[in-house]
Amino acid sequence: MAKKVQAYVKLQVAAGMANPSPPVGPALGQQGVNIMEFCKAFNARTESLEKGLPIPVVITVYADRSFTFVTKTPPAAVLLKKAAGIKSGSGKPNKDKVGKVTLDQVRQIAETKAADMTGASIETKMKSIAGTARSMGLVVEE
């Protein structure tokens, strides 16, 4: 028989840096999950990624207090900021441009995020990433 799901917990945790402090500790402690067990498993799964990169994770907590988790790809905005070499997006994206990204960089980000995005082709995913870039005040160059 399948385990009964008690809760889904969605968090963004820095790759390889999960620890029992907030936001991980309170969110999982509230559900009765062994926090250190999650931290060790998450850090082991994300050790190949760049340390400190925020990774969205969905934790499924079962009634017997066991858990499973699925890691997603980093948010598009984080990957775009890294590609453009900026700290943050523009406060006024239509007026103030803060950086530039090339179509090749947009394609690379779209391919990285392909598993988590909807859309039939890589071109539609690239359009979505380019839209995110424009909303951050980045110029997409040919």
UniProtKB/Swiss-Prot annotation:
Family stated for the protein in its record: Belongs to the universal ribosomal protein uL11 family.
Q: Which InterPro entries match?
A: Ribosomal_uL11, Ribosomal_uL11_bac-typ, Ribosomal_uL11_C, Ribosomal_uL11_C_sf, Ribosomal_uL11_N, Ribosomal_uL11_N_sf
Q: Which PROSITE patterns does the entry mention?
A: RIBOSOMAL_L11
- SMART domains noted in UniProt: RL11 (SM00649)
Q: Does the keyword Ribosomal protein apply?
A: yes
Annotated organism of origin: Haemophilus influenzae (strain PittGG)
Q: How does it assemble?
A: Part of the ribosomal stalk of the 50S ribosomal subunit. Interacts with L10 and the large rRNA to form the base of the stalk. L10 forms an elongated spine to which L12 dimers bind in a sequential fashion forming a multimeric L10(L12)X complex.
What GO molecular function annotations does the UniProt record carry, in alphabetical order?
A: large ribosomal subunit rRNA binding; structural constituent of ribosome
Q: Does the keyword Transmembrane helix apply?
A: no
Which keywords appear in this protein's UniProt record, sorted alphabetically?
Answer: Methylation, Ribonucleoprotein, Ribosomal protein, RNA-binding, rRNA-binding
Q: Name one GO cellular component term.
A: cytosolic large ribosomal subunit
Q: Which HAMAP family match?
A: Ribosomal_uL11
Cite the Pfam families for this sequence: Ribosomal_L11, Ribosomal_L11_N
PANTHER family in alphabetical order: 60S RIBOSOMAL PROTEIN L12 (PTHR11661), LARGE RIBOSOMAL SUBUNIT PROTEIN UL11M (PTHR11661:SF1)
S-S bonds: none
* Example GO BP: translation
**UniProt name for this protein:** Large ribosomal subunit protein uL11
What is the recorded function of this protein according to its Swiss-Prot or TrEMBL entry? Answer: Forms part of the ribosomal stalk which helps the ribosome interact with GTP-bound translation factors.
NCBIfam families reported for this sequence: L11_bact
Describe how it is modified after translation.
One or more lysine residues are methylated.
